Curated annotation (Swiss-Prot):
Belongs to the quinolinate synthase family. Type 2 subfamily. Binds 1 [4Fe-4S] cluster per subunit. It is an enzyme of class 2 (transferase). The lineage of its organism: Bacteria, Pseudomonadati, Chlorobiota, Chlorobiia, Chlorobiales. The keyword Nucleus does not apply. It holds the Pfam family NadA. This is Quinolinate synthase. Disulfide bonds: none annotated. PANTHER family: QUINOLINATE SYNTHASE, CHLOROPLASTIC (PTHR30573:SF0), QUINOLINATE SYNTHETASE A (PTHR30573). It catalyses: iminosuccinate + dihydroxyacetone phosphate = quinolinate + phosphate + 2 H2O + H(+). Catalyzes the condensation of iminoaspartate with dihydroxyacetone phosphate to form quinolinate. Its main location: cytoplasm.
Amino acid sequence: MTTANDRPEEASKLSTEELLERIVALKKELNAVILAHYYTVPEVQQAADIVGDSLALARAAEDNSADVIVFAGVYFMAETAKILNPGKLVLMPDDHAGCPLADSCPEAEFRAFREQHPDAIAITYINSTAAIKALSDITCTSSNAAHIVEQIPPEQKIIFGPDRNLGTWLSKKLDRDMILWQGYCYVHDAYSEVYMIQAMAKYPDAELIAHPECRDEVLRHASFVGSTAALLDYTVKSPSQSFIVATEPGILYEMEKRSPGKTFIPAPKDPANPRSVCTQMKQNTLEKLYLCMVNRSPEITVDENLREAALKPIKKMLEMSA
């Protein structure tokens, strides 16, 4: 039986199986839904009701009958869930799990950036804070970014941020000039062309697949570029039996689960910049997931005026990608 004063030292004595059992019971007690990103640890994905990329999770946050949303991801994801569900309790296993990409775009600096380009609309990656969303016209994810940009008239100038690599990929794919904010995801930006070529030589039968947050020098060698969900879908449908996967390796858990006969090779690290794991996503442990449900904390809150402003570009995204 769980109580609101369960302590971390007590939860740490529970086995994975015991934690999973208690989480199932708590879901019923709270009428909760657990959402987890593909980059979280396998046991958290195992506990989740829905595992997905940013777009799938945003849709799941909007379309559910739960009273409580437990979001295992990074802060902007749980914040987005709260923006979409002001009347629901939104919990997060670790509210210190931030996103350096989102943090690379401060509100005051982005506001000034927009003021430098008054005739441009701002399309911002969902990997951004509520304050940045509130300054934007449309939000997007890597799953729907190309589809959204394609709907903007060609004569309309576009500011895109905060991820410069995703913006560069979109510009080349769509032959569309955009004004780019110079942020990046440290995980994807760390992959280098030299080590990718070496991996392709070492595994000649493997297809290189990559997330568009990678640098252009890496993407040009990939046989397929897509969002986390698109990469997963590609590996299921492709006749290839082995893949070099240039994205955060948390996705390999789901890839191996869906295609148990195939081989998935994490893209190699550059020794000079070996940050190929999102440490913030990994802060969401099964123990923290359990404790946040027991204690109904940490709770995610958003100022109502900010929430209303940030909701508009998110709703616009969902409408344009329906």
